[in-house]
Structures are given as structure tokens and as C-alpha cells.
């Protein structure tokens, strides 16, 4: 769920920032077959703009400018305007747009919202030292760089209930121009973040952890968070059933997040339950990810019993 027209990944990605958008996920909610369904709330165009633009990217609203934590040019191969840094007094408006989008998601019939503070999106930019060079109270120290993320999480939790809100983070994962290369600084940042998130009582913390160093940090964050932990193995390969079992065996995660395999296999759980990695899976078509029409969205076949 994109919180404003400025924050869409591109012109085809789903946005939900006005009452008229409540119907957007209605059909998907109707066909969820008893499962819980959540929307991911994040300023997506910032990631498309290479970790720079906080709300502009490929689709800017008429009369508005792309926004970011700082005025760094976009690295995306697509053509983008150079974003401008958000003024301190504008941050409350951006926070409130996350809240509005979350409310609309719940009114649409969804069960929850995941705040996207990973992969170079706007909230991740505030956390990363190379992206956040602000000189106000939202930049500088590790504690200050977590401030906006915590404010957004608290506001969304207050609006729709903390038990309906999760948050996704990707510590030390260089992506879309955001880098966290200093291990000590990264640990300090995410420990400060999770220490402030824990009292809010969020539904879960989702952490990208795909090697020994990141798993060690995930273990530390899990202990600090004190609630359900989701793990994800990253982008290097499509997650297999064996990968899921290995992540669970680490004893950190309550569940494992699966992306591409699930996109291509709407009945992935049933396939894995029946045959594990011996189950034949549809191959995901990356060209149809993140938007567009029915192709790659509703046309993957399910397993014939």
C-alpha cells in the first residue's frame, strides 16, 4: 500500500492513499480462503530511485516534487527528477500519510499492515548513515536516525492497533543505493530501533538474514524484540523448502517469509506439505512482478490433486 501518489514504485504499482482506493484489494480479500492477508506500506519510489528519492521516482503527482531524506540524485536507469530533502516540518505529514494508508488497508478488509523499513525504501534511508546525512533531530547518531521510523510505527499502531502492524528491516543489506557497511554502527542502529519498537507491541519483526553475521544480529534483535520473529533469506536465490527448514532450525524465527516461490505458486503451502522440494513448482516470471494486469498475478496454475 503506497501512502501517497508520490511514493509509488512506478505507474502500475498499487497505491492506496484516498478513500476511492478502498476497492483496490477487495477481490483479493474475498478470495483469501480463510488466510490472513496484510498490505505492505512503504514509500516505494525511493527504492526505484536507487535509495535516493523518498516519494517521487517515476510517478510524481501534478504540482508536487519527489521527496527524500536528502537531495541525492536517483541511481535508477529510469528517468527521475532529482529529489529534494524533506523539511523537518514535513515529516509529520509523511507520518500521517502512512497512517492514512494503513487505515484504508484495514477498511478494505485486510488483516494487517507491514511497514517497509528495508531494501532502500524511505524508512530504511532514515536508518542508513550513507543515506541519512540530515542535521536536524532525525539524523546524526544511531538513536536519531531511528526516530522517524519509530514515530511512524507508533502512529500506525495507535491508529489500527499494534497487533495489526508488523515491520520489515534488512540490516547491512546493500540495496538500492543504501549501504550499512560499519558492523558496529549497524548493530547500534538496529538495537536502538528494536529497543524502541518492543514496547509498542507490534505483531512481528521481519528480518532479512542470509549469512552468519546477519543471523547473529537477528538473534540479538529477536531477544530485544520479545515478540514473533520472521526471517527471510534474501534475493540471491528463490527460497526452497529446505531453506525454510534450515532457517527454522536456527531457532530464531517463528516463521519464514517466502516471496518469489509464493508469487508463482498460490498453493505453495499445499505443495510443500504434500512433497516438500520434490513438489513441482511454477517458475516465477520476474518481468511480471510488482504491478500490471492479470499476467503473473492471477494466471499461475495451482497443483492438480
List PLM regions with ranges.
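Flavin-dependent oxidoreductase catalytic cores
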Residues: 1, 11, 16, 23-305
Amino acid at each position: 500500500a503506497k501512502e501517497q501518489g508520490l511514493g509509488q514504485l512506478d505507474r502500475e504499482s498499487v497505491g492506496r492513499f484516498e478513500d476511492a482506493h478502498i476497492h483496490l484489494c477487495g477481490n483479493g480479500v474475498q478470495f483469501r480462503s480463510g488466510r490472513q492477508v496484510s498490505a505492505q506500506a512503504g514509500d516505494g519510489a525511493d527504492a526505484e530511485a536507487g535509495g535516493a528519492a523518498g516519494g517521487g521516482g517515476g510517478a510524481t503527482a501534478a504540482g508536487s516534487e519527489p521527496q527524500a531524506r536528502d537531495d541525492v540524485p536517483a541511481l535508477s536507469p529510469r528517468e527521475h527528477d532529482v529529489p529534494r530533502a524533506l523539511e523537518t516540518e514535513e515529516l509529520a505529514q509523511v507520518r500521517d500519510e502512512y497512517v492514512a494508508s494503513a487505515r484504508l488497508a484495514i477498511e478494505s478488509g485486510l488483516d494487517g499492515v507491514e511497514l517497509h523499513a528495508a531494501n532502500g525504501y524511505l524508512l530504511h534511508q532514515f536508518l542508513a548513515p550513507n543515506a541519512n546525512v540530515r542535521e536536524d533531530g532525525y539524523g546524526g547518531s544511531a538513536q536519531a536516525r531511528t526516530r522517524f521510523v519509530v514515530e511512524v510505527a507508533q502512529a500506525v499502531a495507535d491508529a489500527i492497533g499494534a497487533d495489526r502492524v508488523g515491520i520489515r528491516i534488512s540490516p547491512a543489506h546493500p540495496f538500492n543505493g543504501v549501504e550499512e557497511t560499519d558492523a558496529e554502527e549497524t548493530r547500534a542502529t538496529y538495537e536502538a530501533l528494536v529497543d524502541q519498537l518492543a514496547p509498542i507491541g507490534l505483531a512481528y519483526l521481519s528480518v532479512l538474514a542470509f549469512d552468519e553475521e546477519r543471523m547473529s544480529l537477528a538473534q540479538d534483535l529477536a531477544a530485544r524484540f520479545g515478540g514473533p520473529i520472521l526471517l527471510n533469506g534474501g534475493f540471491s536465490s528463490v527460497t526452497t523448502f529446505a531453506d525454510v527448514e534450515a532457517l527454522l532450525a536456527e531457532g530464531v524465527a517463528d516463521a519464514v517469509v517466502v516471496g518469489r516461490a509464493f508469487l508463482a505458486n498460490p498453493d505453495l503451502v499445499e505443495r510443500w506439505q504434500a512433497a516438500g522440494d520434490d513438489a513441482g513448482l511454477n517458475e516465477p516470471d520476474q518481468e511480471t512482478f510488482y504491478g500490471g494486469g492479470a499476467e503473473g498475478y492471477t494466471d499461475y496454475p495451482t497443483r492438480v490433486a
